[in-house]
Swiss-Prot record:
This is Vitamin B12 import system permease protein BtuC. The keyword Membrane applies. Gene3D superfamilies: ABC transporter involved in vitamin B12 uptake, BtuC. One of its GO terms (molecular function) is vitamin transmembrane transporter activity. GO terms for biological process: cobalamin transport. Belongs to the binding-protein-dependent transport system permease family. FecCD subfamily. One of its GO terms (cellular component) is plasma membrane. The keyword Lipid biosynthesis does not apply.
Length: 326
């Protein structure tokens, strides 16, 4: 038994080390790739100063953090709602952030600064989160709370569609494109959004024990002495914050939070002590590679990264649906 535990521990360490190495390689590729390939030896040149340090580095850091946040949000939600198909957009938090942005553009008549739009997106996400918490205070079951989140997402999506359809504002048309997901506008001015993600990411990675209990089901978690109402509310707020900041930075990006936790579980990483840091690393890798594809797929334009992740993630999503139906 002790030998098996040691083998499992070594296997988990090998997984995390391998994912860490892949993060470094993907980061290197992201910094080099673009309309002009800039090798590491040229990073200190005048061209490297502009393209690598001022343009590609902040974008790469944002992609790393958003990928980690979305994958962690998916892992948390799947444990929280005991639903293998749960993902960050499911609770309507992503759409809530979009409604906040559209309201800011309409009320500000396109004159608000980028940081103000970011705050409005976070505010929209947190408002949806607070509504969900109000449902949670009524001690609804997890399945009903999940349905409430789906309904809120549909309402927010309808509001966004109505606002954009009847609007003559060019800013709203651009916002619709931005909501497809993309990091084209990220620079060092968005560093405060990156900093806002880091402490929550670290905190989530340290919450393996309550998440392991929640993954056993509500009844088992309650029998093990977990204050279920407290942890459910706290994790919903943390998830809402991560998704809100991610949407403020890059728009709505789907499937990362759904696919990454599933792939790691299929590889045998079921313990949240390993699954959480593994999701953060794998989510960062997947989104970095998708961002490189979005940049290089077209010669004179950039694909929305949400389109890339949806194209790659939709077949996996269908497979998961078919598998769960069996």
């Amino acid at each position: 038994m002790l030998t098996f535990a040691r083998q499992q521990q070594r296997r988990n360490v090998r997984w995390l080390l391998s994912l860490s190495l892949l993060v470094l390689l993907a980061t290197l590729l992201s910094l080099c790739a673009g309309e002009q390939w800039i090798a590491p030896g040229d990073w200190l040149s005048a061209r490297g100063e502009l393209f690598v340090w001022q343009i590609r580095l902040p974008r790469t850091l944002a992609v790393l953090l958003v990928g980690a946040a979305l994958a962690l949000s998916g892992a948390v939600m799947q444990a929280l709602f005991e639903n293998p198909l749960a993902e960050p957009g499911l609770l309507g938090v992503s759409n809530g952030a979009g409604v906040g942005l559209i309201a800011a553009v309409l009320l500000g008549q396109g004159q608000l600064a980028g940081w103000a739009l970011g705050l409005c997106a976070i505010a929209g996400a947190l408002i949806i989160t607070l509504i969900l918490l109000r449902f949670a205070r009524r001690h609804l079951s997890t399945s009903r709370l999940l349905l409430a989140g789906v309904a809120l997402g549909i309402i927010c999506s309808a509001l966004m569609t109505w606002a954009i359809y009847f609007s003559t504002s060019f800013d709203l048309r651009q916002l619709m494109y931005w909501m497809m997901g993309g990091f084209g506008g990220v620079d060092w001015q968005q560093s405060w959004l990156m900093i806002a993600l880091i402490p929550v990411l670290i905190w989530i990675c340290c919450q393996s024990q309550p998440l392991n209990m929640l993954a056993l089901g509500e009844t088992s978690a309650r029998q093990l002495g977990l204050p279920l109402w407290f942890w459910r509310n706290l994790l919903v707020v943390a998830t809402g914050w991560m998704v809100g900041v991610s949407v403020a930075m890059a728009g709505a990006i789907g499937f990362i939070g759904l696919v990454i936790p599933h792939i790691l579980r299929l590889c045998g990483l079921t313990d949240h002590r390993v699954l959480l840091p593994g999701c953060a690393l794998a989510g960062a890798i997947a989104l970095l590679l998708a961002d490189v594809v979005a940049r290089l797929a077209l010669a004179s334009a950039e694909l929305p990264i949400g389109v890339v992740t949806a194209t790659l993630g939709a077949p996996v999503f269908i497979w998961l649906l078919l598998k769960s139906a069996r």
